[in-house]
Amino acid sequence: MGKVAFVFSGQGAQYTGMGKSLWEKSPAARAVFEAADSQRPGTSQQCFTAPVEELSVTKNTQPCVYCVDLAAARALEEAGVKADYVAGFSLGEVAALSFAGVFPGEEGFGFVCRRAEAMQKAAEENPGAMAAVLKLKNEQVEAICQEFEQVWPVNYNCPGQLVVAGEKGQIEAFC
């Protein structure tokens, strides 16, 4: 068998019911959820039952996605799958670092909770928006951004997908 990489997702991967089957089938995954619940009560139930509108609020999204990311990796590890490499996208980078042992114990989850609260507060104080632009070259998107005072390219995800962010009304006009 070749090398195995665990790739941890970021914000935007949330959905109602995420992680429930891991909780039901894997003691290692269940331990991750229980540890999360000890620091942030209700995290597990939020993953399993919260409507997508609640899960999409940053202060909820990030702890839940992180928890499911880590639970999935622990379940794979428990099943005998060894990661030769770990990587993550945005929030998933923190889960990858935690899984790799960079953060001791439950420190990664605490960090994610503080990060999520800070990001939520910043978003409430400075409302903005983001939009993914598909099927255009980066240079084309960058040129369009220059036509707006408060729209910037922020995430160069992959060829043909660039995320822009800025003032909400200007993002709406951009789209």
Show the residue positions of the predicted features:
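A broad, structure-centric signal for solvent-exposed, well-ordered loop/edge residues
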Residues: 25, 29, 54, 62, ...
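Generic anion/oxyanion-binding catalytic loop in active/binding sites
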Residues: 18, 58, 97, 130, ...
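Ubiquitous "structural anchor" signal
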Residues: 18-20, 96, 100, 174
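Gly/Ser-rich oxyanion-binding loop with an adjacent helix/lid
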Residues: 62-132
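Residue-level preference for short coil/turn positions at secondary-structure junctions
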Residues: 1-2, 82, 126, 158
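Broad structural signal for hydrophobic residues in well-ordered alpha-helices, predominantly aliphatic
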Residues: 22, 36, 96, 144-145
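Alpha/beta catalytic cores of group-transfer enzymes, especially the acyltransferase/condensing modules
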Residues: 11-13, 38-41, 100-175
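Helix-rich "cap/lid" substructures immediately adjacent to catalytic or cofactor-binding pockets
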Residues: 2-87, 164
